[in-house]
């Protein structure tokens, strides 16, 4: 990364942080202030079956369709920050329509495993200045952990090679389309299986895949946290058994 790119990277991070700090200050004073950020789990269906994923990968009763999501987006305050996720958000029918409605009045992030990305879809995203972050889930070099977790996927190497190409294409096209403030992010779930390779994963994401940012995330402490299905209210008082890392010292 050049010095100029590094300075730009720092500047947008500072602006993002300052904007959130300003909103937090306002939230303490203003009554009935709507949230600034929203995470929409468009579907809990997914084209993968990773054993460490907390989502229920079956269609839930009462799940919203694209028309209902679009109607919901119309009720949110202008200039919100919307994250579209899943499951695999690109798997929902009419995803492009949901995205288009989102970026009309809001900033938009997308979290995806990347397998359904295409050049046409990336161009479609990057034409919108309100599209801010594309996040790809990567748990080790070549995402071999996900290959092992999805043994029925016989063409994993070919499909992951496609994702790598799409990420590099994304970085090239955002410059060509003058949308360089859009961020290519990578997210890694910290597991015992990848605990010896965390620095190598970071190098893979930043150096090989040219990601602008890379973050690590731990497994949830409670199944209720960030859940995509309903619990009874009193369940919040029940003791839950968090995952215990065997290689915590290494991590």
Give the predicted meaning of each segment.
Residues 1, 62-64, 132-251:
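Radical SAM enzyme [4Fe-4S]-AdoMet core and its adjacent flexible, acidic
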Residues 2-132:
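Conserved alpha-helical substructure of the radical SAM core
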